[in-house]
UniProtKB/Swiss-Prot annotation:
GO terms for molecular function: structural constituent of eye lens. Required for the correct formation of lens intermediate filaments. SUPFAM superfamilies: Intermediate filament protein, coiled coil region (SSF64593). SMART domains: Filament (SM01391). Residues 200-318 are annotated as: Coil 2. Belongs to the intermediate filament family. GO terms for cellular component: cell cortex; cytoplasm; intermediate filament; plasma membrane. Keywords: Cell membrane, Coiled coil, Cytoplasm, Cytoskeleton, Eye lens protein, Intermediate filament, Membrane, Phosphoprotein, Repeat. This is Filensin. Its main location: membrane. Residues 319-657 are annotated as: Tail. It is a peripheral membrane protein.
């Protein structure tokens, strides 16, 4: 499948010469200047012939390409390849549906297993929580018992301290009483020993002695009683000390045992906490897996629903195509997926490549207009051919680099709406058959319109130069991507009205133009706007045809007036738009031709009243489309300078006016 689009821009510049030109015609300086101008005109004519030859070769290539395209489209009307393609696509979709059904059953089994494991982990987690609750209750009970034992120990210590104080106080009191009694006894013994035995006194003393003796047993009994009480208190003191020691030892042992048990319980609690955290992490992991499985199941269900809609649309479209009845399409917007590497190029990719041409063509139009301004500015400023060639090559190379940079395809990573932890294989996307049919019909209409647009009419007789005829022979030298051809050398035959025939050397074929990069896929929505641009280009091409016809008539008049001698074609024809500075000997002349040229250049009786220069710049952009890839190249061709001499002469009396 081929389609070619041509873009031509014509720019004219005219310069007029005043009547002061007639005043210098008799001077020898004017003769030498006229001879130099004649040589320059011959050189320009030779350059124009080279441009014409290149133009003829381009037209020849276009004619061949259009003929092959017409044959291809005629053969495509007879082929029925879309039904087979759609049948294969439907079979592939059914196979994918069966595979997805098996994957769905497998995922359902995995979901059941995951649900069972989740229930088991729930039960384990519940049991662990109950066991931990029991341990917490036991720990709280033991803490309460330890607190009660500590309080009891403190109370016993306080009570023993009070008892010890009472024992000490009673012991001190009894010691004081005993010391007093002993003091009294000693005093009485001293009194008895020192007292004289006088009868009355003795009688009195005896009475007192009797009284004292009677009191001694009482006092002794009291003393014995006090001693027994003291012994009892001492025994009670020892008993209390023993009990206190035993209680202290019991408290110490209980504290140590409680510390050991608390340490053991703390270790058990820490282990249980770690187990609970591990169980929570495992539970969270399995919960995430279950959620991912549910999401994946939902995506699979959506994809199955989309495939069902696609199959329904295809069945409805095929039934409507067979029965001739309208059909309602059920479309669904879905995100594109990365196709598998094992499959080849499908129809959707081809349509996207075809649809992405217009933005690049706009960029080429801007580049061509910029080239045109640069080249016209250089010519107006009077640059030499060598400088002009260098600047043109630099601009051309820079634009080629920009074009390749803009036409390159940048593969961005696929942004998915939902990313799973475990990467799953994404099924291949399936194009919509109705959209493919519409895009294909629109493409065929555009190609047919382009074929109708570029059917050029045959050139008129008066548009050819009079007195000089150019015959260009040779086959095309451009290698098509799908049609192979053998480049052949071209020949040029120039004949004049005098009968001289000059056959130029072989013309080198046009070198193969560079292949562009593939366009970006994001430009496919611009395919619907190409019709308006094609209509605008058609109008421009009609205006360019009229300008070219006018220029052909003017060229015939120039050749009738000047009648230049024979010139031959240069040895090598440069590519369009590039004038090679490395070929200074563009004109190959003989001495006889130079004499004829100098003699015939100003053979007319009077010189023209005014001279006008016209510059015509033709810029072409050619784009090729094929079913394998898109090829785009451009030709910035020819700058033609034409000198128009008007033969109307003025009278001597009219010069002053």
């Amino acid at each position: 499948m081929y389609r070619s689009s041509f873009l031509r821009e014509v720019r004219k510049e005219k310069y007029e010469r005043s009547d002061a030109y007639d005043e210098l015609r008799g001077s020898p300086e004017f003769d030498s200047l006229a001879q130099a101008q004649g040589l320059e005109n011959l050189q320009e004519l030779n350059e124009r012939f080279a441009s014409y030859i290149n133009r003829a070769r381009v037209l020849e290539q276009r004619n061949t390409i259009l003929r092959k395209q017409l044959e291809t489209f005629q053969r495509m009307d007879e082929l029925v390849g879309l039904d087979e393609a759609f049948a294969g696509q439907i079979e592939f979709n059914r196979q994918r549906m069966r595979e997805l059904a098996s994957d769905r059953a497998k995922l359902e089994r995995e979901e059941k297993d995951a649900q069972r494991m989740l229930d088991e982990y729930h039960n384990k987690y519940r049991n662990e929580r109950e066991y931990q609750q029991k341990l917490k209750e036991t720990l709280e009970r033991l803490n309460k018992e330890a607190d009660e034992a500590l309080l009891c120990n403190l109370e016993l210590q306080i009570e023993s301290q009070f008892l010890q104080d009472d024992i000490n106080a009673t012991k001190d009191r009894y010691k004081k009483n005993l010391m007093e009694i002993q003091t009294y006894v000693n005093i009485l013994q001293q009194i008895i020993q020192t007292t004289p035995r006088v009868s009355p006194i003795t009688t009195g003393i005896s009475e007192e002695k009797l009284v004292a003796e009677r009191r001694i047993p009482v006092l002794q009994s009291q003393l014995e009683e006090y001693k027994s009480i003291l012994c009892q208190l001492q025994a009670q003191k020892y008993k209390l000390q023993t009990e206190t020691t035993m209680l202290e030892q019991a408290i110490k042992n209980t504290q140590e045992s409680y510390d050991d048990e608390i340490q053991l319980y703390n270790e058990q609690i820490e282990n249980l906490r770690k187990g609970i955290e591990e169980a929570e992490r495992t539970l969270e992991k399995y919960t995430t897996d279950c959620r991912q499985l549910v999401i994946y199941q939902q995506s699979l269900e959506n994809e199955l629903e989309r495939y069902k809609r696609i199959i329904e649309n295809e069945d409805s479209r095929l039934n409507s195509a067979i029965a001739g009845t309208p059909v309602t399409l059920f479309t669904q917007i879905y995100r594109p997926v990365q196709p598998q590497a094992s499959r080849g190029r499908d129809i959707t990719q081809a349509m996207q490549e075809i649809a992405s041409v217009k933005p690049r063509q706009k960029a080429l139009t801007k580049k061509l207009s910029r080239k045109k301004e640069i080249m016209s500015k250089d010519i107006t400023d009077g640059l030499s051919p060598e400088k002009l060639y260098e600047r043109t090559v630099e601009v051309f190379d820079q634009d080629q680099l920009e074009f390749r940079h803009e036409g390159s395809v940048t593969c961005e990573p696929g942004q998915e709406e939902l990313e799973l932890v475990e990467k799953e294989a994404v099924p291949e996307d399936v194009p919509d058959g109705a959209q493919i049919s519409k895009a294909f019909d629109k493409l065929c209409n555009l190609v047919k319109e382009k074929i109708r647009v570029y059917k050029r009419p045959e050139a008129k007789v008066d548009s050819h130069p009079k007195g000089r005829y150019v015959l260009v022979t040779g086959e095309e030298g451009y290698e098509e991507p799908c049609f192979s051809s053998i480049p052949a050398g071209g020949g040029i035959t120039v004949s004049t009205s005098n009968g001289k025939v000059t056959i130029g050397g072989d013309v080198e074929p046009i070198p193969e133009l560079p292949e562009p990069s593939e366009p970006s896929e994001k430009e496919k929505r611009d395919i619907c706007e190409r019709r308006d641009e094609f209509e605008t280009q058609d109008k421009l091409k009609e205006e360019e045809k009229e300008d070219l016809f006018e220029w052909g008539k003017i060229r015939g008049k120039i050749e009738q007036v000047t009648k230049y001698p024979d010139v031959s074609e240069p040895e090598a024809v440069p590519s369009p738009g590039l004038i090679s500075p490395a070929e200074p000997g563009v004109l190959q002349e003989t001495d006889h031709d130079r004499e004829d040229k100098q003699g015939l250049l100003f053979r007319e009786a009077g010189l023209p009243g005014s001279v006008s220069y016209e510059k015509v710049e033709v810029v072409e952009s050619i784009e090729k489309f094929s079913d394998d890839r898109i090829q785009t190249y451009e030709e910035t061709a020819m700058i033609v300078e034409t000198m128009i001499e008007k033969t109307s002469k003025k009278k001597p009396g009219d010069k002053g006016s």
